[in-house]
Curated annotation (Swiss-Prot):
GO terms for cellular component: Aim21-Tda2 complex; cell projection. It is found in: Cytoplasm; Cell projection. One of its GO terms (biological process) is negative regulation of actin filament polymerization. Belongs to the TDA2 family. GO terms for molecular function: actin filament binding. Keywords: Cell projection, Cytoplasm. This is Topoisomerase I damage affected protein 2. It holds the Pfam family Tctex-1.
Length: 112
């Protein structure tokens, strides 16, 4: 098994990085709604661009604490365009009581 670290993670993208950013920003400007709807619109746009790829879109929403509240709420949404019979996704939360942290571990698999 060969493991390769690449600094530019968009080098093999079906869209250039600036074009992909424009697509995401335009869908956000048009939808300005829930994370689920944003995911759906981004996936639809990507699928129209190229059907040769499988796409995974994850949206993590973080409520910024206010002066009256020091707590932070985090919400994550996930959407994908794939073959549901062959591909899948699993998220599992690990509670680290000693460190006082939770670790969210996500695994996605896509058939070739």
């Amino acid at each position: 098994m060969v493991i390769e670290k690449i600094d530019d993670k968009s080098s093999n993208s079906p869209l250039t990085a600036p074009r992909l950013i424009d697509l995401i920003e335009s869908q956000f400007s048009e939808s300005q709604v829930s994370a689920d709807t944003l995911i759906q619109h981004i996936l639809e746009s990507l699928n129209k661009h190229s059907s040769q790829y499988k796409y995974i879109v994850s949206v993590t929403s973080i409520d910024i604490p206010t002066e009256s509240s020091s707590s932070c709420e985090i919400d994550n949404k996930f959407g994908a365009s794939w073959n549901a019979k062959k591909d899948g996704f699993l998220t599992h939360v690990l509670e680290d009581k000693h460190a006082g942290k939770n670790h969210v571990v996500s695994v996605a698999w896509l058939s070739k």
